[in-house]
């Protein structure tokens, strides 16, 4: 049979999965926070979010576009983070910022409002692990399958610091991502706070999102 590395295909479906509706730590630890700064993002229709750290930067990605007041957002996150920048993209909203040392990140949702908390002290809000499986199609070609509920549109980002392409899959759930990176010859899954993020190391990789439920 053909190995996964040889097939060079990734298929990520959105399927049915039983998830917790809330992260209990979010409320239980709120009284222990020493410092907290919050970024609020209001939308008029359902929008999905991904968040991850790469190098010294924190990335926040939505799969819909909105022009943000980056000056106001920068004031909101000081002094826990700095250098907030919105990367141009007509289909998505992409923010990159530099958090301070030991800054924790949590994501909350209130209706159509997304809130990203930066904080010190207290316990980290745990990220629930996205399961990733190897499966085979009718032609016996291997692919990766992630049974994710409410995955959004794929967002491709050019990382100006490193010079490569990041493929981001935002979710409509909170604190659900990859806690340990997966490394393959042709691509990497990197650690995330929310969503899935792939780094390509080859040109012939494809991602598909769908609904198997």
Model-based region annotation:
Residues 1-213:
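Short linear recognition/processing motifs and adjacent strand/loop elements at protein termini
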């Amino acid at each position: 049979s053909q190995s996964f590395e040889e097939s060079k295909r990734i298929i990520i479906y959105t399927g049915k999965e039983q998830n917790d509706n809330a992260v209990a730590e979010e409320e239980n630890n709120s009284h222990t926070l020493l410092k907290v700064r919050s970024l609020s993002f209001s939308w008029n229709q359902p929008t999905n979010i991904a968040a991850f750290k790469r190098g010294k930067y924190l990335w926040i990605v939505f799969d819909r576009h909105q022009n943000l007041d980056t000056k106001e957002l920068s004031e909101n996150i000081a002094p826990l983070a700095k250098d907030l920048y919105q990367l141009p993209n007509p289909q998505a909203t992409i923010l990159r910022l530099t958090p301070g040392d030991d800054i924790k990140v949590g994501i909350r949702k209130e209706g159509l409002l997304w809130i990203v908390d930066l904080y010190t002290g207290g316990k980290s809000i745990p990220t629930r692990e996205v399961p990733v499986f190897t499966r085979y199609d009718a032609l016996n070609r291997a692919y990766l399958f992630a049974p994710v509920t409410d995955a959004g549109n794929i967002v491709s980002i050019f990382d100006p610091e490193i010079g490569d392409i990041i493929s981001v899959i935002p979710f409509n759930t909170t604190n659900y991502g990859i806690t340990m990176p997966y490394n393959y010859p042709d691509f990497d899954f990197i650690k995330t706070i929310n969503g899935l993020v792939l780094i390509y190391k080859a040109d012939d990789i494809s991602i598909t999102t769908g609904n198997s439920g």
